[in-house]
UniProtKB/Swiss-Prot annotation:
<keyword id="KW-0010">Activator</keyword>
<keyword id="KW-0804">Transcription</keyword>
<comment type="similarity">
    <text>Belongs to the AP-2 family.</text>
</comment>
<feature type="region of interest" description="Disordered">
    <location>
        <begin position="93"/>
        <end position="126"/>
    </location>
</feature>
<dbReference type="GO" id="GO:0045944">
    <property type="term" value="P:positive regulation of transcription by RNA polymerase II"/>
</dbReference>
<dbReference type="GO" id="GO:0001228">
    <property type="term" value="F:DNA-binding transcription activator activity, RNA polymerase II-specific"/>
</dbReference>
<protein>
    <recommendedName>
        <fullName>Transcription factor aptf-1</fullName>
    </recommendedName>
</protein>
<dbReference type="GO" id="GO:0042127">
    <property type="term" value="P:regulation of cell population proliferation"/>
</dbReference>
<keyword id="KW-0238">DNA-binding</keyword>
<dbReference type="InterPro" id="IPR004979">
    <property type="entry name" value="TF_AP2"/>
</dbReference>
<comment type="subunit">
    <text>Binds DNA as a dimer.</text>
</comment>
<dbReference type="Pfam" id="PF03299">
    <property type="entry name" value="TF_AP-2"/>
</dbReference>
<dbReference type="GO" id="GO:0005634">
    <property type="term" value="C:nucleus"/>
</dbReference>
<keyword id="KW-0805">Transcription regulation</keyword>
<keyword id="KW-0539">Nucleus</keyword>
<feature type="region of interest" description="H-S-H (helix-span-helix), dimerization">
    <location>
        <begin position="223"/>
        <end position="356"/>
    </location>
</feature>
<dbReference type="InterPro" id="IPR013854">
    <property type="entry name" value="TF_AP2_C"/>
</dbReference>
Length: 365
């Protein structure tokens, strides 16, 4: 049927139809060349020494972690990315168009997409992409390797809690800087420069912002900090977590739970000799402490990988508060609280054992 109609049409109509088809193809090619750039890599950010387990069934707070996509809100790249299922997760809007620069340019508006020959010379072109209000830590199935870019180290800083004879240098990753300039801390250039041990200079803030801008991080000029400065503000995450692990080890080995539990039990029974009442109170206390410890083990903040994680679901509103505490203490809070609660449970267990061992069996009949 198509061949018959083609034979019936005149030569002029055939030429005009061919020209229309060529114009349509040129229009499609022009539109495809102006297609907005997508992310070349969708990143998961956490310190390089941590293991992050990606589970899509984990409820994350909307402002912190939001599966199943992954990336950073201000980490934007203007490189070509093949069309995939990731488009449904990103509400990408066309960036501002720029005039083509250089000799031989047509002057038409187009997106600043780097050419293949310029891949190795990133300084020769400008990277233009949109910035979306996305959570700063999230996961995706499109990631080639969750730890592929996690270990990007921005710099190393000397520890603030080390002795002069054994100064330890801690790594500061790009992910940590993103967390520090994001809520709840929202550090400004002055505080961030002090944490990174950058020397104060006339253009120190501008230099820091420019270096972060090359990594895709945006640090606004003149911003004010939102959270109060504490002793943990001066620590980097790796040092804070190192302190937490040492604190947990000291609690396990140096906190004498047995002796303290027996002493408290003797003191309480000397005031009120009701053994049944005392044992019931200890059982209820242990239950409450266990519930709190189980809740902390459900924390899904990326800075809490050093204790076994409970896979029970957790309410997003509660996860938001746990993440706030963990981010304010840079990973120290959750680990330290878990260590303290474990010591308290051991103390309660020793108190119950002492009551069962030393008190008369007639009491329980």
């Amino acid at each position: 049927m198509f061949n018959r109609k083609l034979m019936e049409c005149s030569d002029d109509e055939f030429v005009r139809g061919s020209q229309c088809d060529e114009e349509d193809e040129e229009e499609q090619q022009r539109q495809s060349s102006q297609r907005p750039p997508f992310y070349e890599n969708m990143r998961t950010f956490a310190p390089s020494h941590m293991h992050i387990s990606c589970h899509y069934d984990i409820p994350y707070p909307p402002h912190l972690i939001q599966p199943p996509v992954c990336g950073v809100s201000t980490f934007t790249y203007a490189r070509e990315f093949p069309v995939s299922n990731s488009q449904q997760f990103f509400n990408v809007t066309p960036p501002q168009q720029q005039q083509q620069q250089g000799t031989g340019g047509s002057g038409e508006e187009d997106y600043c997409i780097p050419k293949s020959e310029d891949r190795d010379h990133s300084s020769n072109y400008s990277q233009v992409a949109t910035k979306q209000d996305r959570p700063f830590v999230f996961f995706a199935s499109d990631c080639q390797s969750p730890l592929e870019i996690v270990g990007e180290v921005y710099c190393t800083v000397p520890g603030r809690t080390s002795l002069l004879s054994s100064t330890t240098k801690y790594r500061v990753t790009v992910a940590e800087i993103q967390r520090r300039i994001s809520p709840p801390e929202c550090l400004n250039a002055s505080l961030l420069g002090g944490i990174l041990r950058k020397a104060k200079s006339k253009d120190g803030g501008k230099t820091l912002r420019d270096s972060l801008k090359k990594l895709g991080l945006t640090l606004p000029a003149g911003r004010r900090k939102q959270a109060n400065v504490t002793a943990w503000t001066a620590l980097v995450e790796e040092e804070a977590i190192h302190m937490a692990k040492e604190f947990a080890l000291v609690c396990e080995k140096e906190f004498h739970s047995r002796e303290i539990g027996i002493y408290l039990t003797k003191t309480s029974l000397a005031i009120d000799p009701d053994v049944v009442k005392r044992r019931t109170a200890l059982e209820m206390s242990r239950k409450v402490v266990g519930e709190l410890a189980e809740l902390l083990s459900c924390d899904r903040t990326p800075l809490t990988p050093y204790f076994p994680r409970n896979m029970l679901p957790i309410d997003p509103s509660v996860q938001q508060h746990l993440s706030h505490f963990t981010l304010m203490t840079h990973g120290f809070g959750n680990v330290a609280m878990s260590a303290v609660l474990e010591s308290v449970k051991l103390m309660i267990d020793e108190s119950i054992k002492y009551i069962d061992r030393c008190c008369s069996q007639n009491v329980w009949r």
